[in-house]
């Protein structure tokens, strides 16, 4: 990630970092507008996810998570910024004239060739079924349901590892630390998702955060009792409860929120680490 350094004339330029290597110039046939609904509200207009709202208008880029251009080689033409995710995307020109966006694999550069299918080379950016991959392969964009497209390990810097194959299932270690079973016929992309250092990027000022649609985070202990169970009291008061809670009174900070008796419980060999 190439970082621009500016003359430190203001606090925002002194502390902020800007990636100068990747630009955004999407193709018209691979984008479409979308109704802005990322305000953290449900259908009744009630806040269900805090600290969201505002932000710049976005055009959605159609990403090829299925990689169903089988046995047709494609060339990386551009590496672009995508406002809808923290990973970069790259435009692929296939030999049959098809043009698609895929997630940018770490280390891939303009001019590299990729291909998807069975028995293709184990090369960064290639997509193939898990049954054709050797053990220890680093992968991303992993399918859970055959033919549905990649759903796991799609964020910037995400990488999973193929650690075992037995019967009809393959055992994967996911970025969260979870170890689970997936059908060997499901496909995945070789390599790690690019833009690894995104979590080390310093936005420099509050306005840059608001451009991304993220609002300020306020602690419940400094609110009034009407706004949060932790609020109220004289001066710096404790929360007044045995355990911390959410604004709606449910247990927070450690309470397991996963649905009980979920169908995939039998597929998870080791629960994800906190």
UniProtKB/Swiss-Prot annotation:
Residues 1-22, 224-274 are annotated as: Disordered. It holds the Pfam family Ribosomal_L2. It is found in: Plastid, Chloroplast. InterPro entries: NA-bd_OB-fold (IPR012340), Rib_uL2_dom2 (IPR014722), Ribosomal_uL2 (IPR002171), Ribosomal_uL2_bac/org-type (IPR005880), Ribosomal_uL2_C (IPR022669), Ribosomal_uL2_CS (IPR022671), Ribosomal_uL2_dom3 (IPR014726), Ribosomal_uL2_RNA-bd_dom (IPR022666). One of its GO terms (molecular function) is structural constituent of ribosome. GO terms for biological process: translation. PANTHER family: LARGE RIBOSOMAL SUBUNIT PROTEIN UL2M, RIBOSOMAL PROTEIN L2. HAMAP family: Ribosomal_uL2_B. This is Large ribosomal subunit protein uL2cz/uL2cy. It comes from Helianthus annuus. The lineage of its organism: Eukaryota, Viridiplantae, Streptophyta, Embryophyta, Tracheophyta.
């Amino acid at each position: 990630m190439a970082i621009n350094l500016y003359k430190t004339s203001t606090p925002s330029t002194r502390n902020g970092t800007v990636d100068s290597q990747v630009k955004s110039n999407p193709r018209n046939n691979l984008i479409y507008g979308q109704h802005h609904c990322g305000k953290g509200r449900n259908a009744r207009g009630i806040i269900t996810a805090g600290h969201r709202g505002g932000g710049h208008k976005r055009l959605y880029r159609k990403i090829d998570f299925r990689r169903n251009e089988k046995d047709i080689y494609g060339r990386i033409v551009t590496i672009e910024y995508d406002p809808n995710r923290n990973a970069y995307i790259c435009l692929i020109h296939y030999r049959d004239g098809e043009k698609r966006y895929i997630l940018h694999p770490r280390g891939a550069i303009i001019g590299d060739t990729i291909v998807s299918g069975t028995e293709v080379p184990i090369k960064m950016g290639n997509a193939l079924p898990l049954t054709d991959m050797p053990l220890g392969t680093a992968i991303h964009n992993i399918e859970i349901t055959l033919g549905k497209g990649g759903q796991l390990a799609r964020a910037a810097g995400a990488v999973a590892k193929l650690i075992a194959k037995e019967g009809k299932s393959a055992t994967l270690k996911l970025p969260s630390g979870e170890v689970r079973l997936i059908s060997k016929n499901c496909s995945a992309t070789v390599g790690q998702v690019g833009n690894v250092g995104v979590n080390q990027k310093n936005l420099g000022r509050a306005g840059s955060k608001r451009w991304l649609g993220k609002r300020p985070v306020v602690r419940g202990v400094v609110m009034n009792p009407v706004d949060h169970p932790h609020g109220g009291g004289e001066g710096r008061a404790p929360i007044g409860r045995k355990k911390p809670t959410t604004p709606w009174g449910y247990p927070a900070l450690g309470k397991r929120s996963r649905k009980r008796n979920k169908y995939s419980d039998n597929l998870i060999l080791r629960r994800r680490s906190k």
